[in-house]
Design a protein with these regions (language model features):
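Terminal beta-strand-rich extracellular "head" domains
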Residues: 42, 47-53, 65-140, 144-174
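Fibrous stalk/shaft segments of extracellular and virion attachment machinery
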Residues: 1-50, 54-57
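Extended, low-complexity regulatory regions
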Residues: 59-63
């Protein structure tokens, strides 16, 4: 049978009286831009890179979307130090989704020293990245961030992450 609101006293039904999953939300009733969930990850391990190819450093975040047409906003804050015993240095970031490349950012952060200081380039900073993706399904999504250097592959061109602060990653479903 059905119960009409005329037979229920105001405030008589509380969340404790409802079975888990008894109430669902239709995507069409949610206001545009509603945040459905937020997943976060932080990494404190230092990584040193001296290769001009992308490498897996364990930067991973996972999210299971509620709707296939949801947007996923990825943000990450990498804290890094560039070093090169020459005039310039840079580094690269690759964002992957379930093992496939979404976006390559070659020479994402580029630093060049004044010619009189060519013997050594050191630059410390943080790097924010934001990327907008479409879920494309409701199965768990794994996002990986691969890193590398953009100017050569030797110990004279190095990048170190988490030198003094943790690296933070967020996946937000809207």
């Amino acid at each position: 049978g059905s119960i009409t609101t005329a037979k229920l006293a105001n405030g008589s039904v509380t969340s404790g009286k409802l079975a888990s999953g008894a109430v669902s939300v239709d995507a069409n009733t949610m206001p545009v831009g509603s945040i459905l969930q937020v997943q976060t990850a932080k990494f404190t391990q230092q990584h040193n890179m001296n290769s001009n190819s992308f490498g897996d450093k364990g930067y991973t975040i996972q999210i299971t979307p509620n709707f296939s047409n949801s947007k996923i906003i990825l943000t990450c804050y990498l804290h890094f130090q560039l070093f090169r015993s020459d005039q310039e240095s840079s580094w690269m970031v690759r964002i992957r989704k379930n093992g496939s490349t979404l976006k390559d950012m070659n020479s994402y952060h580029y630093y060049e020293a004044h010619p009189s200081y060519q013997s050594r380039v050191v630059h410390r900073a943080n790097m924010p990245i934001t990327y907008l993706d479409t879920a494309g399904g409701t199965s768990q999504i794994t996002y990986d961030f691969y890193l590398g250097t953009g100017h050569g592959s030797s110990n004279s061109n190095q990048i170190a992450t988490s030198k003094w602060q943790e690296d933070l990653f967020t996946a937000m479903e809207i």
